[in-house]
Amino acid sequence: MKRNINHIIAAMGVALGVLSLSSCIEETYPNNQAVPGQISSSNKSLEYLANSLPSFLTTWNTYGGSDYTQDWGYPCQMYMRDLLCEDFPMSDNGYNYWSYTEDGSSLRYAYYYPFYYYYAFIKNANNVISTTKSSVEGGNKSALPYLGQGYGYRAMLYLDLYRLYEYRKTGVASLDDAADKAGVYGLTVPIVKETTSKTELGNNPSAPFYTMYRFIMNDLNMAEEALGDYSRSNKAFMDKSVIYGLKTRLWLAMASRFEQSADDLAKQIEADKNEDGYGTLGITSANDCFAKVAEYAQKAIHADTYKPLTEAEWSDTNTGFNTANDSWMFGTLVNSKEQINTSEWYTFWGWMCSEAAWSMAQFNSYRCISKALYDKISTKDWRRQSWVNPADAGEKINAAGKDSVPAGYKTKMTGEQWAKLPQYANMKFRAGSGGITKNDLETGQIASLPLMRVEEMYFDYFEAIAHTQGVEAAAQALQDFVNTYRYTDGSYKCKAKTMDDFITALMVQRRIELWGEGLVFFDYKRLNLPIKRHYAGSNYEPSYQLNSYAGYVAPWMNYMIPEDEKDRNPAVVLGPNPSGAITAE
């Protein structure tokens, strides 16, 4: 089962060579993708078409072969984003199929798959928009919710895509100079709409940020209007609350950018005059954007009966982080064996279920929290039990001659099974239905995953009011939240007096709360926060102990558009390859 990483990367290169026969953007027809010409205008057919969107969230094997270990849908994108940060080490990297990505030495192929996956997904959303729009224009108003799904999903995908692939300064002179020479600053990715022709695909420039923002906002506005009072059947579909959440994310990205750059703000204001059909943002300052963050975060929080996870829900051994509840605003839906891949190295759950005998844990491949972050979690914070305290790790238990699970942890593991757990191993993500035995490989992977939780909206709101109401008000709000929902004794104090101190305190809470959910990557990038894996006692393998530069984006967080895309679309602008730009200290 253990594989040579060079072989894996080479295999990916072969696959990408096959894909390069046709543009990644141009030819993307996954097997479970509904093509407009195959769909009638009946509501049943339109429902089938719209169902292809949540289905594609969990689609694996989009390269058309089973040898690509980084090809398991949207959860794979989340996993990759977290391993590029600083809180996600592995206990033993012998079976780490992401080693060349995690140590930053060979990144180009790692960025190819997300580019292909996202544009394949966008193709799917465009198909939904094209067909349902025709139906609505033909008088079928019951198709509006399906149209809203298309616009909402497409907005989410472009929001991710531009944040991943836009080049931001790294502090590495050779990279930043190369980016400047290429003219890549301020550019994102090409926009492909349902109306984009094949001819246009061959000359489709990378959109500047000020166009991309307005394009995404326009999609979100269209989605909000189309969804109306739509009541969804499950949380893999979007309703207005999810659109509010996506607007919150977008406004926050803009707010951070314009706070840092008056020139970018001026360009955005000027772009409001463009007659490209995307509408206007109507802002004059970064604080206007922060006010919008606060507004839409509140709308999202109060749009439904959302409430933060309780300790019981968080740590439930059957449903913890695998079953939708009142905290989840949006997520995947996996409820049948037909939706899963039973290769443990090929799924989110195979890599993240520390308790499961069928997972990669059987090869000592545990995803852990970083020592630096774990040390910041108070003993009064019940989330602390989501990771194994070094004093409770298997080697300590064995040395002490104990044969039971230490007190305080909620698990179905026996003492004998616990004795294999390394320090800092995660207990956050539970196997489906609590299926952790060797025979539960199928049952344990019938598990959903949150893509947006209400807690994120609270954190975004706190950051926004730090700018609009002041640090003192935001610090008090954060303190109240943590004491109400996460501490057992109300002892948490947020003592921040400056904006920098508040952002530091807030990021600690984001990193703890959202660990493993693929979201803090975007916070690091928009706030120019450094990655720090090299420090005394670090539990990262030495070759992975990369430290990026303060005040800049870590080089590996600037995804690189595949070079062969330029062969099909000469108008696209490519950023420099960040591989090896920073090495372990």
For each of these PLM feature ranges, what is it?
Residues M1-S22:
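Sec-dependent bacterial lipoprotein signal peptides
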Residues C24-Y79, L84, N322, G350-C353, ...:
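Membrane-proximal, proline-rich intrinsically disordered regions
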Residues M90-R168, G202-M212, L220-S233, E442-L449, ...:
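Conserved, well-structured interaction surfaces
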Residues V128, T132, L161-Y162, A223, ...:
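Alpha-helical solenoid scaffolds that mediate protein-protein interactions
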Residues L147, R154, L161, K247, ...:
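Structural register within alpha-helical repeat arrays
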Residues L164-F215, R257-E295:
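Short coil/linker segments at helix-helix boundaries
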Residues E270-P450, V454, T488, E513, ...:
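Hydrophobic-face positions in mid-chain alpha helices that act as interaction patches
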